[in-house]
Amino acid sequence: MNITNKFQHTPIQGQPQSNLQAQQILLSQLHQGQAQQQQQQQQQQQQQQQSSAGVLGSGFQPSDNFGESLNQNIYQNNYQRAQPSLQQQFFPQFQQSQQQPSQQANNASQLQQPYQPAQQMVRQTSHFQQQQQQQPSSQQFYSQQQASVLQQQQQQQIQLQSAHQQQSSLLNMNSINVDNPNSVYWQHQQQLCQISRGSNVPHYYARQYASNSRKAKNPYSEVKSVGLVEATRSMVASLEDEEEKKKKPINYQGTPTTSAALLHNKKSTQDIFEDDSMEEQRMRLKTQGKQLWCQLDLSGQGLVNISSKLFHYDFLESLYLSNNKLNSIPSSISKLRNLRTLDLSHNRINELPEELGLCFNLRYLFLFDNNIKTLPYSFGNMIELLFIGIEGNPLEPSIANLIAEKGTKELIATLRDQTTVKRTPKPRCWLTLEDDGEVVDSDEVYKVEPESSDNFTVLSYNTLCQHYATPKMYKFTPSWALQWDYRKNLLEKEVLNYNTDIVCMQEVETKTFQEFWLPVMTANGYKGYFFSKTRSKTMSETDSKKVDGCATFFKNDKFSLIHKQNFEYNSVCMGSDKYKKTKDLFNRFMNKDNIALISYLQHKESGEKIAVVNTHLHWDPAFNDVKALQVGILLEELQGIIKKYRHTNSNEDIKNSSIVVCGDFNSVKDSAVYQLFSTGASKGHEDMNGRDYGKFTEDGFHHPFKLKSAYEAVGELPFTNLTPAFTDNIDYIWYSTPTLQVKGLLGGVDEEYTSHSIGFPDANFPSDHVPILAKFQLKKGKKNHSV
């Protein structure tokens, strides 16, 4: 193509010389830039087609990369600007009339190109003189062109903004407006919500798991895809690392702090299982390998309701119900106590059941894009919850702002502390026993009966020392219900209302005994003694008063004290040659500072002498052998005390002695401790496997007493210790069957109340243990009046 020949023409009369020079300059530029012009025209035509089809078209459809292109267009100013071409700037006579709307549309297409096509330029040049007479002056026309260009730019911006708003409305449905949207917690909410919205295919989690499993088997495969749960776990871990760095104290080598010394040999946390692999391993061990799966993906199935049979699968650890049409969640979801991950996102849920708060093992709860307006206070029980996804819900601003400012853990703590005393348990019923031991069913409440010459009552109660009642240990308890002032008032009221003849308490602080319990009990006709744990001997006077121990009280008008003896298990063992000093004895037994308090009392009405033992054994289930050895030593030493104060060496007299052993034994029914008490012997029990304690493991444990649990008639209580990590019966009152008979028992805690609770203490129960109470009758003809 010869540009010079095509565009040459004769000078036009009356045309200014400056315009002719400008034409020559333009022709020279066109001649030099022909190749670039054609390339630019092709690129611009493609951009116009994409723009008209993708953004400016009437049928806008959002795409996956729309946000990226939109950011480039709006924020980087890369979209096409409508600018006058060189000919329009310097040759106003080349323009057609701008008055008709159809011609304006054509001009808009032309204005987006830097140069006009050459053929059009020739045609306009040939009619230059005629159009010069019809067009207004150059300055006036250029002003009109600028106005037209500005109008078109505004229209483009309006269309782009409309498209951006449409895309934003699709990606940010019901977005919550919080006061601080730039906080790291809220950024995580939005990021994870976007990931969740992208997981809208049926069985999303199952597909992802299968895909990642295939990639894991192929060493050359691409990197595994990161799903919602993995992304959440990563974000939570990074936050915890940052918080840990801020809180990390300086680690000084040397003597432990006072708090560390007080908590020696005491469990200091109620954490369930912090590692996912440990939890899965525990589940497999619990089911003995019979349960091979623990996750269920029902996402994207269009479910409207959930069958109640689903909640019989109490082994489930992950349940995915996202992208369905659920309007509500059944309250029976509380049966899934092992759940760690629950996804209810993208449904139509209006309200969450309070029972969901009983799923205290939950760590990740996703509720994105529902119609939830508030969260129940029972969510304060979710002590393991690390993240709750609430973006896309019309949630109360106070809750949303709390999550945005302080995160999920602070939300749970706030809901927990805002819990009020809404529910009160029914009084514990009183169980009456006939002479043959049969329990009489009754709804009667325990009442203090008139004194009888041959009856007495015994209460055993672990009152929870205030130094152990920490927010870290009892994360599920409202902070106000954990305060000692609140708890001690409940404890005092409870103990005095039962008004038993003998009271055995465990975990009583030394200072609390001296300044609180002793004055209170003395004022109500009791006399009491106290013995603290061994560690108090190695501490200063101030710190030693914070150590806990056992306290025994008895009514002055019912009993008189013959003798009392403090009992340290490790000291007794080391001070006697009859206990073999083995490796296990030193490494496992000697560093436990548990104690017992033995009171030898005489019943004033009958003259019967009764040995009352109050003890608290070691807590750790990994040391069940130590507990069995402690009980073996206790019963062996008790024989010596009875022989001494009954002035007898007869085994028959020892068997017929009146004995009551109370305490927190930290042992369940199938333990070696229970076996030793109830049968009189324990040999070859699994608790002692692989241990060497001399004669206790070679010959087994033996004692001559005939002891029985007071609650054996009812098969023991469902529990005496209730926490999220452990719920079972570990407190007992043992009695000698030849001389004593059980006539009444304090029943269990209201089942309806405990079904809505994950652990004690709470607003109504001041300790993690519940008291046990038994009424005994001295058997006729078995009384021994000798002193």
UniProtKB/Swiss-Prot annotation:
Reactions mediated catalytically: Exonucleolytic cleavage of poly(A) to 5'-AMP
Give the cofactors, semicolon-separated: Mg(2+)
Pfam families per the UniProt record, alphabetical: Exo_endo_phos, LRR_1, LRR_8
Query: Which InterPro entries does the UniProt record give?
Result: CCR4/nocturin_mRNA_transcr, Endo/exonu/phosph_ase_sf, Endo/exonuclease/phosphatase, Leu-rich_rpt, Leu-rich_rpt_typical-subtyp, LRR_dom_sf
Q: Does the keyword S-adenosyl-L-methionine apply?
A: no
Q: Name one GO molecular function term.
A: RNA binding
What EC number is given for this enzyme?
3.1.13.4
Q: Which parts form a coiled-coil structure per UniProt?
A: none
User: According to its UniProt record, where is this protein mainly located?
Assistant: cytoplasm
Which UniProt keywords are given for this protein, alphabetically ordered? Cytoplasm, Exonuclease, Hydrolase, Leucine-rich repeat, Magnesium, Metal-binding, Nuclease, Nucleus, Repeat, RNA-binding, Transcription, Transcription regulation
Q: Which GO terms describe its cellular component?
A: CCR4-NOT core complex; Cdc73/Paf1 complex; P-body
Its BP terms in the Gene Ontology are: cellular response to starvation; DNA replication; DNA replication checkpoint signaling; filamentous growth; filamentous growth of a population of unicellular organisms in response to biotic stimulus; filamentous growth of a population of unicellular organisms in response to starvation; fungal-type cell wall biogenesis; nuclear-transcribed mRNA poly(A) tail shortening
Q: Where are the LRR repeats?
A: 291-313, 315-336, 338-359, 361-382, 384-406
Annotated region Disordered: the residues are 37-70, 92-137
Residue numbers binding Mg(2+): 507
Query: What PROSITE patterns does the annotation carry?
Result: LRR
**Superkingdom of this protein's organism:** Eukaryota
Q: Where in the cell is it found?
A: Cytoplasm; Nucleus
Q: Where is the composition biased (Low complexity)?
A: 37-54
Biased amino acid composition, Polar residues: 60-70
Q: Which family does it belong to?
A: Belongs to the CCR4/nocturin family.
Q: What is the documented function of this protein?
A: Acts as a catalytic component of the CCR4-NOT core complex, which in the nucleus seems to be a general transcription factor, and in the cytoplasm the major mRNA deadenylase involved in mRNA turnover. Ccr4 has 3'-5' RNase activity with a strong preference for polyadenylated substrates and also low exonuclease activity towards single-stranded DNA.
UniProt name for this protein:
CCR4-Not complex 3'-5'-exoribonuclease subunit Ccr4
* Gene name in the database record: CCR4
